[in-house]
């Protein structure tokens, strides 16, 4: 396992070198536009969990909107994310120029990291970041009360391994937020529930070579089972909507707690 190298601050990048995943009101700058606008719905996104006074580990902070919101709510936040030095879990379609796709994604991630540090300075954030793979959570990363995984598992080749590696660092609660499966998937979920089966939907399509960066649709029941196996058996599921560009997207949050 790698050692945990926490980054506390970086030189503030030029905004022209930034990409913002979240729409945010950045102090001293104003509104920046991103794909997701979670403003005013952060509490629902986190399943109503009170983070005040808690040590929180956020996996996949992206532009940091949820990170900075949790700080304003009184949490001490640490984040784990990718940098341009790590590879996204791309789907390795045969015949696809995966090397070019990986290079393009790494360049995009660097701009995303820049957006985080631009906002980090503007908000006066004290959050720290470790850059690395979720599969290789450093043993010396420390212990946290709460961990959050916002729209992360669907992008991972092995979502359970990531959750398992995370679980040893969390003492109280893991919060998993994801996109709600579509109508067809929900029908199969109901049938699966009746049969005692927890469906997992594989999204990559060899004929289209798409999607390139998303592997799964996970049902709330499956994530609840993941959490139970990992030692967080007291589970609560909530549903909500969030804004993705100009659309309202159905989401769910699974909160798993230790006994």
Each predicted region: which residue ranges?
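N-terminal, positively charged/glycine-rich alpha-helical extensions of SAM-dependent methyltransferases
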Residues: 1-27
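Conserved alpha-helix/loop element of class I SAM-dependent methyltransferases that forms part
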Residues: 31-54
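Conserved class I S-adenosyl-L-methionine
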Residues: 54-62
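Conserved SAM-binding loop of SAM-dependent methyltransferases across substrates and taxa
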Residues: 63-75
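Conserved SAM-binding motif I beta-strand of class I
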Residues: 76-82
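S-adenosyl-L-methionine-dependent methyltransferase catalytic module, highlighting the catalytic core
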Residues: 109, 135-139, 144, 157-258
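Conserved SAM-binding strand-loop segment of SAM-dependent methyltransferases
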Residues: 124-134
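A conserved beta-strand element that flanks and buttresses the S-adenosyl-L-methionine
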Residues: 148
